Each structure stands twice: as structure tokens, then as C-alpha cells.
Amino acid sequence: MPTFELLIKGGHVIDAANGVDGIMDVGISGRLVGAVESDIPSSQGRRVIDATGKYVMPGLVDLHAHCTGMDGSFFPDEMCLPYGVTTMVDCGGSGWRTFDDFNLNVVRKSAVRVFALLNIVGQGMEGDVEQNVEDMDAEFTAAKIRQRSDVLVGVKVAHFQGMGWESIDRGVEAARLSGTFCLVDQQAKPSRPFSEMLERLRPGDGTTHCYGYDKPIIGNDGKVKSHYIEARKRGIKFDVGHGGASFSFAMAQPALEQGFPPDTISTDMHRSSLLTSRATMTEVMSKFLAMGMPMAEVVARSTWEPAKWIGHTELGTLTPGAPADITVLEFQDRPAGLSDSGDSGPRILRAEGRLINQMTLRDGVVKFDYDGMAKDDISERPTTDLNLP
């Protein structure tokens, strides 16, 4: 009798949590990973999937995307599962006033596992787009996070155009009170230099859009600015958050060459970023692969590293007993044009190919199957009763 409901054989398995990077088989028992071994007999799988020539990895974890609170936000399933994302973090779309509605209408209805960073503004990204200082309440924000820690994993501060540090200071305080982290999206201003902003963050806090042209990590001398290097030494994290106007090869390429990779790879996906820059997880991963980042590192920063940051180490791994969230990617070996975004162009990186998603499993169930890897061939007789009147 087969041991596993599903057996994925012959793929190149990458699991950063366990140091796995090679040809392995993955057995799935119900909703959980059952085994990751070098050669599991095909007889042990009720259904066997041939993943030869493909990469098998934990389901992708997108730390920064938008499925509520803004024009262009999307319902998670159709914009995550086709690109290998099984877990996403809504990045500040809701605040403490609006979270319950978001949870009812999006989180609970989505097949994708949805977490959220709670906006420091009570209304979230609705209305005046995060400018209302009076609605930035650290205690109410922290209380909601503590109340709904099953979904809420941190605090988001973004887009504040005022002169002072109120938004960031209150966001950091809310994170401190809730025992979580604060993620900041903030442009530099003469009254608010980026170097000082980084000093206001604590170890475990971070900033997104780290390679945005309007937040230049590279100075006029072509070097990574010293305050970024010092911040990383203090434990500040840096997220990609590609978006429609927040990723530049002119920033990312020299930063990588100088040993300053992102901690996490994410999309900042919304309608505009998808249409203008194709900001899907597989496409953003392809850009880092094309810039020379090894595949194992690309996968780690798209799975295990974001899972650790949000405090859910049961995810982003293929450890036996972990949820069977699994993504199967293939490198499409043909010339590809990979676009950046925003004020630097946009510009195109000519690459040898790109990653495409072949299959997405969520809790052991196939949710997306691009080439029908888990389906029977048409030569197999359908089971429908053809004698019906």
C-alpha cells in the first residue's frame, strides 16, 4: 500500500532550512511533508509526479504584497498561486480600524495563507493615504496585533509626507508593544535623512524598496552607503519590495557585487506593478538569478528568510511534518528581457532565461498545475458513465 498520497520524484530540491540542495524525492502525507529522501520507490506514491529537470522548493513566501486597502490591490489566490506563492503578507493595507473587515472578506476566503502587517494608521491605506498623524495610535495598533496574532505579524509605516518622525516613531513603538517588527517604506527628505531613519529602527525592524532609485543605496562614488552597512551590522533587515516604481538595476547590481544582498525577495505586487514591471515572485527571483545570485540563495530569500522574519518557521521549509506547501519551478532557457521600474528608466536586463512556475501545492493539494504534471494523459479512459440517458 502506498505510503504517500503524492510523490514528487527526481527534482532538484532546495530547502535552505535544512541545507538541502540536490536531486531528491519529496513524499507528501495528507497535508504535511512526509519525507525528503534521495530515492523513494515510485511504489510508495499513490500518485507520482516526475519533476526531472525542475526545482522543487517550499512554497514561496511573499513578504510584501497588497490585497486590500488600495486601488489596484488584488484577491490573493489568482495573483499568488500561479506564481508559486503559498504565503503572502499584506503590507499595511489595513489598520486597527479596518482589519476585521479585511480578515472577514479576504483572509478567511483565500486559499493562499495570508498574514498582514498592520498599518500604523488606523484606517490603513484608505483615504488620505497614511498622512493622518492623529490616527497613528501605537497602543491601539499593538492591541489589535496581540488580539489577532494568528494573522498579524508586524507593523507597516509608509508614505508619510510630513516633516517629522511621528509615523516611524509610533510604528516602532507599536512593534515594541506587540513584540513584533516594524517595516518602513519612506523616502529620504532633507528634514528626514535616510541615515537617521535607519538609526531609529531596532534590530529585527527593516525597510522595504531597498533598491529603489529614489532611495539610493549606492552613492555618487558607486559604493554602498556606509549607513546601510552599519544598519545591517545592527540587525536591520532589507526587503526588495519590487513594485511598479521601486526597483532599479542601477542600485541592485552594484549592491550585490559589493556583498549587500537583500534579506528577503518580495514583489510589492498590485495592479500597476504587475502590468508595468511584471512584479511576480518568479519574475523578481529571475532578476536576482540573472544578476548572478546563486539559485539556492534566491530560493532562501524567497522562502526560509521571510518565514523566519514573520516568526513562522513552520513555513518556508520541507522539514518532515511541515505543511506541504510546495512550489515546482522550471528555468525557461530562452532569451528574456527583465525590466526594472521607476525613476531609473525603466531599463531591461537581457538574460539567458527566466523562472516559470509549473506547480503550486498548498497543504498537500495541487492548486496550480501549468503543464498538467499531476494530471492523467488523455489516453487514460475517463471514469464518467457514458451510458447516462
What are these regions (language model features)?
Residues 54-77:
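Di-metal (Zn2+ and/or Mg2+/Mn2+) metal-binding site signature of metallo-dependent hydrolases
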Residues 57, 106-117, 174-178, 231:
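Alpha-helix-loop-beta-strand connector modules within alpha/beta enzyme cores
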Residues 11, 26, 31, 53, ...:
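Divalent metal-coordination and catalytic microenvironments
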Residues 11, 323-380:
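C-terminal cap of metal-dependent C-N hydrolases
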Residues 154-275:
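Active-site core of metal-dependent hydrolases
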Residues 250-335:
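His/Asp/Glu-enriched, well-ordered alpha-helical/loop segment
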Residues 78-159:
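Divalent-metal coordination cores built from histidine and acidic residues
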Residues 1-57:
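Histidine-rich, glycine-flanked metal-binding segment
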